[in-house]
């Protein structure tokens, strides 16, 4: 699946992701750069709506739900990271790759 196809699928899936509490979604890594191999995973960065009142295990479960929703839509193994949990150095490293979806 090309980068443009992934972006289109994620935009189509946005209502379901928003229903799960996702307020922002971006992709990064090899799929965002366009140099992914067939076996590359899809790296996503998410923000959860603070009004969703998700904490602890409920938040971890939601992240898993988001990954499964994206995997079902794209057919690509997905790894979701919470934007607020990433280290500043990691944020700097992925900044050039980052493509905001919504």
Task: Describe each region flagged by the PLM.
Residues 30:
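P-loop (Walker A) phosphate-binding loop of NTP-binding proteins
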Residues 27:
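Conserved histidines in hydrophobic membrane contexts and catalytic metal-binding motifs
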Residues 45-49:
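Short hydrophobic/aromatic beta-strand micro-patches
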Residues 39, 43-44:
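A short, structured beta-strand/loop element
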Residues 1-24, 33-34, 38, 51-102:
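Catalytic core of pol beta-like nucleotidyltransferases
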